[in-house]
C-alpha cells in the first residue's frame, strides 16, 4: 500500500457562514461513524434507508441503523479486527453495505471497496494490494468468481457473505449479526477512543482499464468536509425522499449519501433498470446523478417522442420549449 496517493484534506466552513450554523454539530465530529448516535437521537423513527430492488428489500429507521452499526462493529471486534486493519468490501448498494461500511469505521478499520462486476483478477489484486485481513462479499457468486479461494481462506481473519444463505465456511449475515448481538448484551465496550480526523476511512480503486488499479485513500476529514459543505448545493429537510442509483463505492455517491443521511433524509436504493419506475414510485426531491444518466433519459424520451402522433409531438415540443428551470434561492 506504499504507493497510494492521498487526497488532500479541505478547509471547513467559516463559522459565520449561513450554512455553518446548521452543520455545527457535524463540524465537531472527527470520524464519519460518529454521526449515527447523533442522528439516532435527532431523527429516531424516521426511515433512513429503504432498499427497493435488493434481494432482501430491507428498510431501517435511524435508530435501527445506529444500533445495527454498533452491533456489527462489535462483531468485527470479535473476529479480531483492530484499528488500521483493511477489509475489502465487494458489493453494490444495500443497507447491509452501509452497515458494514460504518461498522468498520467505528473500529477505526479501513475498507477497500469495489463493485461486483469487476474482473476477478482486479478484485484479487485489490485484496492483496490493500493488505486486507478480511473480506466481505455481496453473495456467494462473488466469492465463487475469485480464483485464489484456498489462499484467502488461510490468510484472512474472516470472509462474510452479506446474504442470508449458508455456504461453505463463509459467515452469513444473520450469523454475523447474531455475534454482534451477543457481544452487545455482554456490554462489550470499545477501547478508549483514539480516533483522529486524519485516519484513513476507505481506499477507492480505479478501474484498472489502463493497467493495474490504483488505490486512493480517503480520510475521515475528506468525507466530513463533503458532509458539511454539500449544504451549499442542497439543503434538504428531514424526511426528504432521496433516490440513490449511482454505485455507492464511487466517492461521489458515497459522499452524497453520507450528506443526505446527516440531514435526516430517507434514501431509497434503486438501480438503472428500475429507475424510471422508482422515480414515479418515490417522487424524489433530490438525487445525486451524473450527466450520462440524464443524457440516457433524454435520448430515451426523444426516441419515444418520435413514435407518437404528430399532433402530440408538436404539443410536447411546445411545452418543452416554453418550460423554465426551477432554481433554489
Model-assigned labels for residue ranges:
Residues 47, 181-205, 212, 235-241:
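Conserved pre-ATP/AMP-binding loop-to-beta segment of ANL
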Residues 224-241, 248-329:
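Conserved AMP-binding/adenylation subdomain of ANL enzymes
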Residues 8-18, 35-60:
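AMP-dependent adenylate-forming
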Amino acid at each position: 500500500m506504499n504507493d497510494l496517493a492521498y487526497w488532500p484534506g479541505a478547509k471547513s466552513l467559516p463559522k459565520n457562514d449561513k450554512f455553518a450554523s446548521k452543520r455545527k454539530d457535524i463540524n465537531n465530529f472527527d470520524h464519519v461513524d460518529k454521526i449515527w448516535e447523533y442522528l439516532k437521537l435527532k431523527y429516531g423513527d424516521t426511515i433512513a434507508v429503504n432498499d427497493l430492488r435488493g434481494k432482501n428489500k430491507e428498510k431501517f429507521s435511524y435508530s435501527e441503523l445506529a444500533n445495527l452499526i454498533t452491533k456489527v462493529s462489535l462483531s468485527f471486534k470479535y473476529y479480531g479486527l483492530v484499528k488500521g486493519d483493511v477489509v475489502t468490501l465487494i458489493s453494490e448498494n444495500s443497507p447491509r453495505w452501509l452497515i458494514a461500511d460504518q461498522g468498520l469505521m467505528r473500529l477505526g478499520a479501513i475498507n477497500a471497496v469495489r463493485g461486483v462486476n469487476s474482473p476477478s483478477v482486479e478484485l484479487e489484486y485489490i485484496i492483496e494490494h490493500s493488505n486486507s485481513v478480511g473480506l466481505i462479499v455481496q453473495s456467494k457468486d462473488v466469492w465463487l468468481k475469485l480464483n485464489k479461494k484456498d489462499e484467502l481462506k488461510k490468510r484472512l481473519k474472516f470472509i462474510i457473505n452479506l446474504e442470508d444463505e449458508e455456504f461453505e465456511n463463509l459467515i452469513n449475515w444473520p450469523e454475523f449479526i447474531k455475534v454482534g448481538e451477543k457481544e452487545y448484551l455482554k456490554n462489550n465496550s470499545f477501547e478508549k477512543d483514539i480516533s483522529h480526523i486524519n485516519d484513513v476511512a476507505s481506499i477507492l480503486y480505479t478501474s484498472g482499464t489502463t493497467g493495474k488499479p490504483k488505490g486512493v485513500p480517503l480520510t475521515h476529514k475528506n468525507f466530513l468536509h463533503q458532509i458539511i459543505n454539500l449544504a451549499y448545493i442542497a439543503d434538504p429537510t428531514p424526511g426528504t425522499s432521496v433516490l440513490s442509483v449511482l454505485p455507492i463505492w464511487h466517492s461521489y455517491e458515497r459522499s452524497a449519501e453520507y450528506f443526505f443521511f446527516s440531514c435526516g433524509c430517507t434514501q431509497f436504493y434503486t438501480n438503472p433498470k428500475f429507475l424510471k419506475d422508482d422515480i414515479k414510485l418515490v417522487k424524489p426531491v433530490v438525487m445525486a446523478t451524473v450527466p450520462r444518466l440524464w443524457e440516457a433519459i433524454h435520448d430515451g424520451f426523444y426516441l419515444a417522442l418520435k413514435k407518437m402522433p404528430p399532433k402530440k409531438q408538436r404539443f410536447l415540443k411546445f411545452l418543452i420549449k416554453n418550460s423554465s428551470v426551477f432554481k433554489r434561492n
